[in-house]
C-alpha cells in the first residue's frame, strides 16, 4: 500500500447543519489522518476556478452558487491509499444510491448537497491541495 495525500471539502449543507465533527469522525474512523484543515467562504471566482473542469456542464452555475452559499471546510487527508479510501467512505455522489454507513448516505441531502467533495485521482488531489494550501499549512 502507498501513503497518499488527498483533498476533501466539507460542503455548506453539512456546515449549516453542524456536521463537521461527524464528517471528521467518519474520515478518522476510516483510517485517514487530517493533516490540514481550514474553514472559509469561497468567492465565486475561487469556486469557478476550482470547478473549471465542469464549466461546460449544465450544472456548473448552480454548483458555483451552491458552494458559495456558505462556509466550507477544506482539508488535506493522509493515509494508505487515501484517495480510494476517502472515495469509499464518502459514498456515491447521489445519497440515495450511496451505501449505508457512508458520509453521503448518512449525512447528504441531495446530489448537490451531499455534504462532501473528495479528489478522484492523484492528479486531482495534487491540483486541489495546491489550489487551497501552502506546504507550510500541511502538518506531517
Curated annotation (Swiss-Prot):
Needed cofactors: Mg(2+)
- Which residues are ATP-binding? 11, 59, 87, 93, 104, 114
Q: Which reaction does it catalyse?
A: a 2'-deoxyribonucleoside 5'-diphosphate + ATP = a 2'-deoxyribonucleoside 5'-triphosphate + ADP; a ribonucleoside 5'-diphosphate + ATP = a ribonucleoside 5'-triphosphate + ADP
**Catalytic residue positions:** 117
Q: How would you classify this enzyme at the top EC level?
A: transferase
Q: What InterPro entries does UniProt report for this protein, alphabetically?
A: NDK-like_dom (IPR034907), NDK-like_dom_sf (IPR036850), Nucleoside_diP_kinase (IPR001564), Nucleoside_diP_kinase_AS (IPR023005)
Name the keywords, alphabetized.
Answer: ATP-binding, Cytoplasm, Kinase, Magnesium, Metal-binding, Nucleotide metabolism, Nucleotide-binding, Phosphoprotein, Transferase
Q: Name one GO molecular function term.
A: ATP binding
Indicate yes or no for the key word Kinase.
Answer: yes
A Pfam family of the record is NDK
The EC number of this protein is: 2.7.4.6
Work out whether the entry's keyword set contains Nucleotide-binding: yes
Location in or out of the cell: Cytoplasm
One cellular-component annotation, GO: cytoplasm
Q: A Gene Ontology biological process annotation?
A: UTP biosynthetic process
* Quaternary context: Homotetramer.
What family is it from?
A: Belongs to the NDK family.
This molecule's function is given as: Major role in the synthesis of nucleoside triphosphates other than ATP. The ATP gamma phosphate is transferred to the NDP beta phosphate via a ping-pong mechanism, using a phosphorylated active-site intermediate.
What PANTHER family does its record include? NUCLEOSIDE DIPHOSPHATE KINASE, NUCLEOSIDE DIPHOSPHATE KINASE DDB_G0292928-RELATED
Q: What is this protein called?
A: Nucleoside diphosphate kinase
**Source taxonomy:** Bacteria, Pseudomonadati, Pseudomonadota, Alphaproteobacteria, Rickettsiales
Amino acid at each position: 500500500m502507498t501513503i497518499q495525500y488527498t483533498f476533501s471539502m466539507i460542503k455548506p449543507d453539512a456546515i449549516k447543519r453542524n456536521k463537521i465533527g461527524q464528517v471528521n469522525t467518519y474520515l478518522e474512523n476510516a483510517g485517514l489522518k487530517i493533516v490540514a484543515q481550514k474553514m472559509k467562504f469561497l468567492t465565486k471566482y475561487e469556486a469557478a476556478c476550482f470547478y473549471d473542469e465542469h464549466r461546460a456542464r449544465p450544472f456548473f452555475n448552480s454548483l458555483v452558487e451552491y458552494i458559495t452559499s456558505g462556509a466550507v471546510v477544506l482539508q488535506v487527508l493522509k493515509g494508505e491509499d487515501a484517495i480510494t479510501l476517502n472515495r469509499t467512505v464518502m459514498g456515491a455522489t447521489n445519497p440515495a444510491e450511496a451505501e449505508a454507513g457512508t458520509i453521503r448516505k448518512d449525512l447528504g441531502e441531495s446530489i448537490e448537497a451531499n455534504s462532501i467533495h473528495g479528489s478522484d485521482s492523484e492528479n486531482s488531489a495534487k491540483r486541489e491541495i495546491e489550489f487551497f494550501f501552502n506546504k507550510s499549512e500541511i502538518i506531517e
